[in-house]
């Protein structure tokens, strides 16, 4: 039977519940347990697919095509379980399910209420995502005290009663601020946060206390006394140099042993050698490279969270310190690509909408003409095609119909038909809703022999995750290829261009998919690893000049 660990957060948001949950999951996995993680988000959106990255951060895409919270990216980077659409539910999705049932008459004319109908649906979704695992860790988004979180908190309160204390426990993550002027840590916010939680019927079994510095035994004893939590179960989680140290920090305080004991789990001792290896490798840096990230959401790093982590992973596996320099594409549009002179490599990530596109095109032109290593992802590949069509093929004004429906040379257009991850045919047009209607999830891609892409991956066929509506217009492929563009990757049915590269460039690759979603610190991703190695070579060549 599945055991449940419910994780809540208090005092302030952005404490790192997702990292803490994923780290504990990694330790439990290292003890031989099958672990999954579920994120419950209180917002009314059905999913984050149409939300602004400035508000939500990146949208993480699962292999089965779900658009989910970025915390699922943390989950996949820390544990080996592949996340699915069952690992993320929002208030909007829960209410949508309940309203559909009400319209069908499933409630037999009854009055539909938050309790029991919404809470029952929340419990059903949790159990659906947890099925067949030894342990399910369920993270409740938001902060205790927020009105939006109340149905979720009520649902997990009920689950604890229904399952019993040996099948469900509560972990509360809270802030213990350090006041520099007095040199003291303050426990009062934590006390009040737990008081708020207890007022709705939830008594935490474990407290994880986020702080700048390790908590003293006296502070831990004080927190334990005022929150009714065992002293050994008050865990100090101070700021770490790397998030990949956190499994070791939690294990050193016996958090996994506390959890195993409370849930009566049979598990071997944790083998964290894999995580120790990652941390040791991260400490070895023989060179620093500067990689330009040219995007439109550069004010918020979380908008490119998985790419940032993928570059970090590549650095770990190449003994490289990767310094990401963020460039607002509109600044390059205004001031030119000479801003990129000191850069060792250029990356243009995905995005939507016309703003900043011309700046991205200028950055790509600079990379092509100056032989700077380049990696384009999703929109990054599309803008690379536009740049090549305009400046090499000579199709002046070439564009995507996403940005200019009247362009004379629509080198990119809306995909009207494709096969979904499960093999079903999807059909779209300009009037289709924006939400949940893109080409999403893992898709097969065939790599052409003798190409850089084939060399990087080392195999003829790959599966990568997609999130897009527009694709290269096959009408212009022959002309592009004739002028030196190499189509190095195509969809399984050969109808869609998935990867491009240049014949006369040392390292120029672009892909329609999102390789960042499958990178992890243990193995890195070949595309990012080779990109960082190319940046190292370019850096060394610059030094010789």
Swiss-Prot record:
Glutamine amidotransferase type-1 domain mapped to chain residues: 290-541
Organism: Legionella pneumophila (strain Corby)
Name of the protein described by the UniProt record: CTP synthase
Entry GO terms, CC: cytosol
Residues where ATP binds: 14-19, 71
Binding sites annotated in the UniProt record for CTP: 13, 146-148, 186-191, 222
InterPro entries per UniProt: Class_I_gatase-like (IPR029062), CTP_synthase (IPR004468), CTP_synthase_N (IPR017456), GATASE (IPR017926), GATase1_CTP_Synthase (IPR033828), P-loop_NTPase (IPR027417)
Activation and inhibition: Allosterically activated by GTP, when glutamine is the substrate; GTP has no effect on the reaction when ammonia is the substrate. The allosteric effector GTP functions by stabilizing the protein conformation that binds the tetrahedral intermediate(s) formed during glutamine hydrolysis. Inhibited by the product CTP, via allosteric rather than competitive inhibition.
Binding site for UTP: 13, 186-191, 222
């Amino acid at each position: 039977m599945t055991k449940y660990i419910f994780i809540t957060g208090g005092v302030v948001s952005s404490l790192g519940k997702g990292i803490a949950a994923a780290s504990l999951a990694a330790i439990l996995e290292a003890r031989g347990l099958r672990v999954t993680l579920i994120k419950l988000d209180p917002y009314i959106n059905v999913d984050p697919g149409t939300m602004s990255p400035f508000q939500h951060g990146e949208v993480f895409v699962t292999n089965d095509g779900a658009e989910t919270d970025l915390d699922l990216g943390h989950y996949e980077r820390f544990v080996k379980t592949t996340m699915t659409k069952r690992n993320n539910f929002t208030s909007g999705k829960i209410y949508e399910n309940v309203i559909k049932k009400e319209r069908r008459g499933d409630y037999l004319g009854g009055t539909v209420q938050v309790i029991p109908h919404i809470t029952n649906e929340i419990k059903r979704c949790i159990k659906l995502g947890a099925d067949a695992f030894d342990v399910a860790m369920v993270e409740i988004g938001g902060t205790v005290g927020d009105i939006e979180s109340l149905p979720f908190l009520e649902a997990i309160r009920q689950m604890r009663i229904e399952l019993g204390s040996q099948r469900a426990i509560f972990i509360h993550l809270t802030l213990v601020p350090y006041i520099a002027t007095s040199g003291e840590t303050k426990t009062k916010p934590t006390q009040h946060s737990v008081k708020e939680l207890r007022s709705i019927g939830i008594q935490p079994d474990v407290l994880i206390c986020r702080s700048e510095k390790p908590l003293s035994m006296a502070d831990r004893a004080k927190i334990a006394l005022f929150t009714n939590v065992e002293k050994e179960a008050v865990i100090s989680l101070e700021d770490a140099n790397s998030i990949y140290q956190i499994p070791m920090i939690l294990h050193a305080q016996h958090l996994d042993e506390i959890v195993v004991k409370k849930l009566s789990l049979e598990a071997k001792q944790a083998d964290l050698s894999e995580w120790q290896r990652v941390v040791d490798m991260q400490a070895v840096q023989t060179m620093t490279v500067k990689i330009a990230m040219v995007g439109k959401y550069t004010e918020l790093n979380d908008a490119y969270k998985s790419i940032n982590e993928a570059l970090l992973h590549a650095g770990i596996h190449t003994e490289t310190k990767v310094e990401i320099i963020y460039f607002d594409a509109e600044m390059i549009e205004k001031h030119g690509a000479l801003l990129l002179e000191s850069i060792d490599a250029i990356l243009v990530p995905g995005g939507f909408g016309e703003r900043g596109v011309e700046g991205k095109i200028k950055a790509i032109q600079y990379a092509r003409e100056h032989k700077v290593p380049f990696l384009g992802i999703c929109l990054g590949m599309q803008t690379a095609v536009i740049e090549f069509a305009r400046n090499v093929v000579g199709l002046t004004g070439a564009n995507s119909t996403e940005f200019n429906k009247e362009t004379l040379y629509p080198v990119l257009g809306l995909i009207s038909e494709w096969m979904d991850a499960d093999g079903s045919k999807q059909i779209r047009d300009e009037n289709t809703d924006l939400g949940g209607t893109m080409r999403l999830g893992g898709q097969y891609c065939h790599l052409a022999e003798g190409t850089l892409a084939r060399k990087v991956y080392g195999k003829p066929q790959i599966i990568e995750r997609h999130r897009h509506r527009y694709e290269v217009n096959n009408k212009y492929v022959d002309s592009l290829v004739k002028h030196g563009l190499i189509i190095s990757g195509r969809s399984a049915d050969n109808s869609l261009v998935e990867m491009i590269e240049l014949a006369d460039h040392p390292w120029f690759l672009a892909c329609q998919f999102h390789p960042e979603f499958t990178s992890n610190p243990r193995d890195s991703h070949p595309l990012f690893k080779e990109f960082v190695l190319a940046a190292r070579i370019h850096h060394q060549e610059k030094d010789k000049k």
